[in-house]
């Protein structure tokens, strides 16, 4: 098989196999071919991973932030040296085109290790509080054992985005990738340990929806960070609340992208395409509700149709391919069902809408699809599709579009295209979302916080803000004089 790992799990610095677990077949989305067979973690494997993390964490926390950061930066260097190999593995794992993975996936993961490794000495400072004769100080301390639960759209990136801040704060992590994309996280574990990470600090176990509760409910776990769907997030948050665990949730969205009539039209079309078709539309922050001012709608749709139909769909390993398959057969069927709902509910199909005829019939392909004349009450405008389906809605005025954009249970992200920067700032101030873009879309460098509001989650990934979610403040009051007691 093309990508068979040494074993299913990586625990305490070594590969571990346990064939008692349910078989997980890793399928190449472009062909449906089995490229690896792994096993889900049994309860014994879960216990072993958490025990290793708990055992290793105190000594790691006692190291200086500089020493911890040095290891992460070394891991970043190794990832960059092996970018091509990691990118090819990511393409096999997800089906995303190699032209995407070589610039986006391992690269972003390496950036996370470099960023958090570099800010460790300065980012983990406390404060000094003068109190007259006395004083107090605060310090940031690690939480302990953290659990990371990944999604299947950016498996390597997500593993690094969670591991980097957790480790630099002095925690240990047990990471469970999606059963659809089990391979990348194992390579990240290898690289971290090659870079000098002590054993037991980053463990990877495979599993499905039955494995997550074993991790989330474990009494030795202090923190859970999930990237996934809203229903999964609700279940995990409810379980974590029972033991008062720290939680970060990066969930789904149905984000608005607003195009005003003074926008650079080609840039707006390009932004809408990036915000709907990159990674075959499997991006949580996608601006899938594209609100276009009526005066430019026809020209916007004309240019969008031409560019969408010119996209190259094909073999993800071909450097020319711009659109790959969905991650799984089930996801493709879900997307096709939403396209059919859009047609049935009266939306106008502008481009795509089916399965391309130039690819393997065994692959999980869907054409990039554009609907116009979409109304706010249509299913495709309300529910997260998580595929290459763009909904174009029209509007007249600013107040109107803001109210409609906010009329959603989600609040992950949003965007505005306009030449009027005063209006741009005014609009983003009123949009109910955690991450917003002006005259661009879906750029997420590790230097900036990323996360949502409302049903799209809470907490933040990346930037200095992430340190707050993998540590807690300890306050120390220092008395400098005799104790005065009334008794």
From Swiss-Prot:
Annotated metabolic or biological route of this protein: Amine and polyamine biosynthesis; betaine biosynthesis via choline pathway; betaine from betaine aldehyde: step 1/1
Residues binding K(+) 1: 26, 93
Record: active site: 162 (charge relay system), 250 (proton acceptor), 284 (nucleophile), 461 (charge relay system)
Cofactor: K(+)
Cysteine sulfenic acid (-SOH): residues bearing it: 284
Pfam families in the cross-refs: Aldedh (PF00171)
InterPro entries: Ald_DH/histidinol_DH, Ald_DH_C, Ald_DH_CS_CYS, Ald_DH_CS_GLU, Ald_DH_N, Aldehyde_DH_dom, BADH
Description of how the protein assembles with itself and partners: Dimer of dimers.
Similarity-based family: Belongs to the aldehyde dehydrogenase family.
Family matches, as HAMAP family: BADH
The protein, known as: Betaine aldehyde dehydrogenase
Biological source species: Rhizobium johnstonii (strain DSM 114642 / LMG 32736 / 3841) (Rhizobium leguminosarum bv. viciae)
Gene: betB
